[in-house]
Amino acid sequence: MSKFAIQHAPEQFSELVFAQSDIQRRLEEYAACKRTKPIILHGTYGGGKSTIAKLLVTARDPINRGFWQTINCSNVEQGFLTPIEGTWRFAELLEVEPMCVLEEADLLSRRNQFDLRAFMDQHGGMFIMTTNHLHAIDPSIRSRCDCIEIEPPVAENYLPVVQKILASHGVAMGPQPLLKVLDACRNWRDVLGA
């Protein structure tokens, strides 16, 4: 991610922009700890799934007790859940919700997916998984999760955020020229690079 994109990335769940209000409301319920089922965020590249996952975890743990981990599944090996289990047990002793973000969960091997399913059944807790390929996640895991498709917002959804970013750099532009540029953007990465 570029320095500009990092500088203007959302820092709180409330700063996220969604294409669908029903998905936003559903995820707000997760952020407020009103829902507890594990989540699989799926959709196209650059739709913001990893950012949503990170901000959901920080919303659910606002004082940052640190009982959560983020794992990119592209390079995990057999036994990848062992360190998570230690964190999980300690969190449970303190009566804190253990959480784990599994990015690119579809890249877990079949064996690792079965281990994950068994871990979910044995320990519970909040898993938030991201994937561009929902079909590559075993149906037994999908059935235990709330599978939420994240569609990239459209130009009108991005407009207020883009105007705020431009204003922070002393640039004021009306909506029409910005909408022309934003109409060509397919996702957040395109918007931040425009």
Where does each model-flagged region fall?
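Walker A/P-loop
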Residues: E29-I71
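Pre-Walker A (pre-P-loop) alpha-helix and adjacent loop at the N terminus of AAA/AAA+ ATPase modules
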Residues: S2-T44, G86-F90
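Short glycine-/polar-rich loops that comprise or flank the Walker A/P-loop
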Residues: T36-K37, I63-W68, E97, H123-G125, ...
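Conserved catalytic/switch belt of AAA+ P-loop NTPases
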Residues: W88-R89, L102-S143
